[in-house]
Curated annotation (Swiss-Prot):
Residue ranges with Low complexity bias: 24-43, 60-74, 124-163, 233-253, 290-303, 311-324, 336-355, 392-405, 435-450
Protein name: Putative uncharacterized protein DDB_G0284695
Sequence ranges of Polar residues compositional bias: 75-90, 113-122, 361-382, 414-434
Source superkingdom: Eukaryota
Region annotation Disordered: where it falls in the sequence: 1-178, 209-450
Length: 450
């Protein structure tokens, strides 16, 4: 492949076997420039070069066509790349001058990019022979270009085959340097037939990559485990990628720790949130056993058990850790007395027993046998007893018998409810009747019930 422009730089990818022919052509062109129309072959060579730069209607179209055909298959370059600097096309930069150029006595040598005087001389000396030679040379050059293109295509095909073999079966981006044809590690510079090789950087140095390289920057140290470092020498990272992908696939399949299978747990009876084995609606149908542990760590009946079995005792532990009847048991047991829900160790009547209350029973508080009021340790009447007795103690903290609305008609005289001081050493009759008027005045007082 060749790159041609007005600056005079020709980048040619050629094999080493073509170096001799190339050097001869370069010498002929340079000698023709120095001698200025000495022979027709060199004249036509220089003339063709300038016409390639300025004649857009003829040669540039052919050159662009050839260049486009060669550019369609750009492949990595050969190890050696040659650059031909023609004397008439090199700029006046002193770094491009060789010792032979500086010591040359030929006054016709010019280092300007465009030698207009030489070009005018060649144009004035055109003749039929030169035109014929020019046509022949153009044909030869076209044939050579076609041959070079064919060789480049063959080389490109070989390179493609080699690259396909290397990357076969790999689904990852490899850190590989793919250089463009105009960039190579070693350049061969030819100035007036003198060759000089320049090595840009070492072959093993990967610090500088070509402009068209496909590579990623190296990652920082101590990176997370799921990020791997780029390896420029081997494919170990590919195995790491595959292993990571396999691990992710295993997690997605519902393995231990995976989000798809973490909730399955046991079958039939699963561990609920209280770490106790019991039935849960998520288990589906309840287990055969009618009784199981509920969520309160106490074995008892649960609505999920369905109807209690005949073998199951009618009484079972409720949720308060006390054995008693529960509405979930259905009909109360035959016993008219059972323990209530107040965690009391005293048997008493409960509305759930149905029917009328027994003649005497304990109330819902921890009291002695018999019936008594709720706030005192004294026996008293309760609405659950039915009709009140003829006389009873009131509900106030008095140790004295007195009238109560529940007694019906009040007695002729009674003590009031105001806790007035009285002589506790006297008998009740002495306190109730006016035998001691002074004491009675201190104790007896009017009451609305009078």
């Amino acid at each position: 492949m060749s790159y041609s422009n007005t600056s005079g730089y020709n980048f040619n990818n050629r094999n080493d076997s073509d170096n001799d022919e190339e050097n001869n052509n370069s010498n002929n062109i340079n000698n023709g420039n120095n001698r200025n129309n000495e022979n027709n072959e060199n004249n036509e060579s220089l003339k063709r070069k300038f016409e390639e730069s300025f004649d857009e209607d003829e040669n540039n179209n052919n050159i662009n066509t050839n260049n486009n055909s060669s550019n369609s298959n750009i492949q990595p370059p050969s190890k050696r790349q040659e650059i031909n600097y023609n004397v008439n096309d090199i700029s006046n930069d002193s770094s491009y001058h060789s010792d032979e150029e500086e010591n040359s006595s030929d006054s016709d040598v010019s280092l300007n990019k465009t030698n207009n005087s030489t070009f005018e001389n060649f144009k004035n000396n055109k003749n039929n022979n030169n035109n014929n030679n020019n046509n022949n040379n153009n044909n030869n050059n076209n044939n050579n270009n076609n041959n070079n293109n064919n060789n480049n295509n063959n080389n490109n095909n070989n390179n493609n085959n080699n690259n396909n073999k290397e990357e076969e079966g790999e689904n990852f981006i490899e850190s590989r340097t793919v250089s463009s044809p105009e960039i190579s590690n070693t350049y061969v510079i030819t100035i007036n037939g003198n060759k000089k090789e320049i090595e840009l950087y070492g072959k093993d140095d990967t610090t500088y990559n070509s402009q068209s390289s496909v590579s990623l920057p190296p990652l920082v140290d101590n990176a997370p485990p799921h990020i791997h470092h780029i390896d420029f020498n081997n494919n170990n990272n590919n195995n790491n990628n595959n292993n990571n992908n396999n691990n992710n696939n295993n997690n997605n399949r519902g393995g231990r720790g995976g989000y798809r299978g973490g909730h399955r747990g046991g079958r039939g009876a699963s561990n609920n949130y209280n770490r106790n084995q019991q039935w849960h609606p998520s288990d589906g149908t309840p287990p055969p056993q009618q009784q199981h542990q509920n969520r309160n760590n106490n074995q008892q009946w649960h609505p999920s058990d369905g109807t209690p079995s005949p073998q199951q005792q009618q009484q079972h532990q409720n949720r308060n850790n006390n054995q008693q009847w529960h509405p979930s048991d259905g009909t109360p047991p035959p016993s008219s007395s059972h323990q209530n829900r107040n965690n009391n160790n005293n048997q008493q009547w409960h509305p759930s027993d149905g029917g009328s209350p027994p003649p005497s029973h304990q109330n819902k508080y921890q009291n002695n046998p018999g019936y008594q009021k709720r706030n005192n340790n004294q026996q008293q009447w309760h609405p659950s007893d039915g009709t009140p007795p003829p006389s009873h103690q009131n509900r106030n903290n008095h140790q004295q018998q007195q009238w109560h609305p529940s007694d019906g008609t009040p007695p002729p005289s009674h003590q009031n409810r105001n806790n007035q001081p009285f002589n506790r050493n006297l008998s009740p009759n002495q306190n109730r009747y006016p035998q001691n008027q002074q004491k009675m005045q201190q104790q007896q007082q009017p009451h609305p019930s009078d």
